[in-house]
Amino acid sequence: YSSCGLCGSTSLKKLRLKTKVNLTSISHKKLLPVNSLFGLPKLMRQHQVLFTNTGGVHSAALFNDLMALQFVYEDIGRHNAVDKVTGALLTLTEPIRAEGLHILVVSSRISFEIVQKTVMAGIQVLAGVGAPSDLAIKAAQQFDLTLIGFLNEQGCNVYHGDWRLNTDG
């Protein structure tokens, strides 16, 4: 287990007590075509200036349900890159934030802390190029977060929340 960022605890109960966001109550009008997600890491990579220069930073990007890039941020710490994206999202006005599904894509594995930050920001879909931890999967299940790992141009693994995805065609 990894720590959850809440006083060093690995408890989902503590996150549940702190979380006021209900991801299932956030309205969305359409399903995301799962094959449209496959190109998102490449699109994110095209905007990674620091990674191009150093090869040593992580990135996090926010896409809307039309797969349009909203933000991409880089940092040496994967959690910091996520913080930058969620911070930028939270500065937007409420109507813009409520326009539909948002997809957070990370260039790393998916830890519980990243799931926690995604849930707290009200983002419904989290996808990473690496694997999610066991605790990340359990948290995604508890909070109805669509969790996708090993996202690449050939496919992905959906660990939870496939009802937000259209797998036809």
List where the protein language model places each region.
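Intrinsically disordered, low-complexity regions enriched in acidic/Ser/Thr/Pro/Gln residues
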Residues: Y1-A60, N64-D65, L69-F71
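Feature captures the catalytic cores and cofactor-binding loops of soluble hydro-lyases/lyases
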Residues: H79-Y159, T167
